[in-house]
Amino acid sequence: MDKFTQDIKDLEVTTVERARQAIANKENATFFIGRKTCPYCRKFATTLASFVAETQAHIFFINSEEPSELEELQAFRSEYGIPTVPGFLHIEN
């Protein structure tokens, strides 16, 4: 298992649709948007893994390289002002 995959193992892999549902349902949720080929995402994932290990926080992961998600993810990122990865979105209602 590569380092990035190891670092995100405690995150819940999810979709843009799930993120939109969380927003619509006014859930408290945190999303990390990234990809393993991004050096900044890999560095952030290492920091995030430590945070999750210490706090047991529940964080969702959206893979920005998932082919089936690309178009919807681009619209989502534009809508919520996430120009690049790594992206981080925390929703608290």
What is the predicted function of each stretch?
Residues D7, F32, K36, S64, ...:
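Conserved short-loop catalytic and cofactor-binding motifs
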Residues V16-H58:
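Local sequence-structure signature of Cys/Sec-based thiol-disulfide redox active-site neighborhoods
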Residues M1-A19:
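N-terminal "domain-start" segment that seeds a small globular fold
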Residues L11, P39-Y40, E65-S68:
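Residues that cap or flank secondary-structure elements
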Residues H58-N93:
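Thioredoxin-like thiol-disulfide oxidoreductase module
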